[in-house]
Amino acid sequence: MNAIYPGSFDPITFGHLDIIERGCRLFDQVYVAVLRNPNKQPMFSVQERLEQIAKAIAHLPNAQVDSFEGLTVNYARQRQAGAILRGLRVLSDFELELQMANTNKTLASDLETVFLTTSTEYSFLSSSLVKEVARFGGNVEHFVPSHVAAALYDQFHPVVERDRLT
């Protein structure tokens, strides 16, 4: 069975990678699907996020990165996926995730949502938190792959400012 793992991944974190790696052990193919949402202003473009994710999952032969727009259930059908993979960090995540799972089940009764709890060491981690730490010059290499940390640093601290910080 194939699964999709949808999200904004702005940026991808070790928490996301934890879910992807574990999902790859459960499913034949996992499509890491970057949602193209015209109503949001992400830090990284869709293309940048696709490249960041592709590099981060290169070691996983049954993971593939893609982007989509519109309903998740339609994308799942397009990819012939029988499951939507979702990660849960804390209890407060569950309420919204359950609401989305029930909506998706109503729209596509043959599609299951599979929840994986994030490993304990990543339970506090979010893309928003990573961006906040990076914005104030903190080291984010414990939270994201090194190529993503470099991209964050470049985004928040251009070359001119970088010289001042070092």
Curated annotation (Swiss-Prot):
List of residues binding ATP: 8-9, 16, 87-89, 97, 122-128
HAMAP family assigned: PPAT_bact (MF_00151)
Protein name in the entry: Phosphopantetheine adenylyltransferase
Gene Ontology cellular component annotations, sorted alphabetically: cytoplasm
Keywords noted in UniProt: ATP-binding, Coenzyme A biosynthesis, Cytoplasm, Magnesium, Nucleotide-binding, Nucleotidyltransferase, Transferase
Organism: Synechococcus elongatus (strain ATCC 33912 / PCC 7942 / FACHB-805) (Anacystis nidulans R2)
The keyword Transit peptide is annotated on this UniProt entry: no
CDD domains: PPAT
